[in-house]
């Protein structure tokens, strides 16, 4: 807190500090949104940083194409130093969710985009105050409000992941992703958008709940009571998830893992990742 106050005194034109009780990342972001004044807002997680040229690149891009949301790439640092992630969608072209439903499938982090501030002032969309998946919930909802989305090929965000990071939290916390997905599905259903984006929402559920959460558990141990719950959750909300057209594009290894998970062959999945050195 002292360092923040010092920086604010040294740079009063661009730094303001709000001291509040710790309520998690989502709660902090919501509090900051009420103070934001610029045309766009960005979200920077602790330990992460922007590349030196990030703001110049963003400013030029948004001046040329003033989109409501402007995505950019990230590079992993720390344990996965050098890995680069960008979206496999048309670049530097204004997109909308109805025309490009695959926008729902891009990386869910709120930190890899500049968001027009009026998206928040004109809607009641905010971050979940607590629990895993606060980014996924906000970003998947906000895409329905955005009139235009632009994706830049530039890697502007440096994401640091290490053994103590939130993304490597306790195994039991994987249950929270089910709450996050349910929050998104309920939101789309309430607005009559579920059927329009059912395939995309189904893939979102398969990826985040059935695959990612199960794999995080099975890389660490061969059994856990949460594993069948993840499968039952997915099957209850998307009974035909195995026939989702997006799943045809999965790599062979991921298809194999999903098949084994669907048969509750958890030990086989554990051994598969153990053999690969995970």
Model-derived features: where do they sit?
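Membrane-interface aromatic/basic loop that binds lipid-linked glycans or pyrophosphate carriers
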Residues: 219-278
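Catalytic core of nucleotide-sugar-dependent glycosyltransferases
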Residues: 155-163, 168-195, 208-241
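Acidic donor-binding segment of Leloir-type glycosyltransferases
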Residues: 1-19
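General small-molecule cofactor/ligand-binding pocket signal
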Residues: 18, 150-152
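Glycine-rich, basic loop-to-helix element that forms the pyrophosphate-binding segment
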Residues: 2-3, 20-36
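Short aromatic/hydrophobic "clamp" motif used to bind/position activated sugar donors
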Residues: 41
């Amino acid at each position: 807190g002292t360092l923040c106050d010092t920086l604010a005194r040294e740079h009063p034109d661009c730094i303001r500090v709000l001291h509040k009780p710790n309520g998690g990342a989502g709660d902090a972001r919501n509090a900051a949104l009420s103070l934001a004044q610029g045309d766009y807002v960005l979200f920077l997680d602790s330990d992460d940083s922007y590349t030196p040229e990030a703001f110049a690149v963003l400013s030029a891009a948004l001046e040329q194409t003033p989109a409501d949301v402007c995505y950019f790439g990230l590079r992993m640092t720390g344990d996965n130093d050098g890995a680069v992630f960008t979206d496999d969608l048309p670049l530097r072209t204004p997109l909308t969710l109805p025309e490009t439903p695959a926008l729902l499938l891009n990386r869910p982090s709120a930190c890899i985009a500049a968001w027009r501030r009026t998206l928040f002032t004109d809607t009641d969309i905010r971050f979940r105050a607590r629990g895993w998946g606060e980014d996924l919930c906000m970003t998947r909802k906000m895409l329905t409000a955005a009139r235009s989305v632009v994706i830049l090929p530039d890697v502007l965000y440096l994401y640091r992941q290490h053994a103590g990071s939130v993304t490597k939290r306790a195994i039991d916390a994987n249950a929270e992703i089910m709450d996050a997905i349910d929050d998104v599905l309920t939101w789309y259903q309430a607005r009559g958008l579920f059927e329009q984006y059912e395939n995309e929402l189904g893939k979102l559920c398969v990826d985040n709940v059935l695959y990612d959460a199960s794999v995080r558990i099975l890389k660490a141990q061969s059994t856990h009571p949460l594993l069948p719950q993840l499968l039952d959750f997915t099957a209850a909300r998307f009974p035909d998830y195995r026939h989702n057209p997006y799943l045809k594009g999965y790599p062979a290894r991921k298809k194999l893992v999903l098949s084994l998970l669907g048969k509750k062959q958890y030990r086989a999945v554990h051994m598969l990742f153990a053999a690969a050195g995970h």
